[in-house]
Amino acid sequence: GFDENIPRILKEGQGIEVTEGSWEILPVFRFLEKYGRIAHREMFNIFNMGIGMVIALPEEDAAKAVAILEGYGERASVIGRVTDREGVVIK
């Protein structure tokens, strides 16, 4: 999930701030959260809320990376930013 996997791609002392809603969250995840009575934050650790892969790169390269991925037929979104505070924060 987010809390274990994303920090592994970052340098020591870094974390990530994820902006919820910056990608399409499929209805199945809302269904599972509601009817499975799963805490909202826990959904990010169990199901990644539909995120299949995270790539961390310099902010100035983000738009180009999204364009390249979309050029290959992939859905891509900028979902957050790297911070100088360890851990994963979801806003």
Where are these regions (language model features)?
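Glycine-/charge-enriched secondary-structure boundary and capping motifs
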Residues: G1-K91
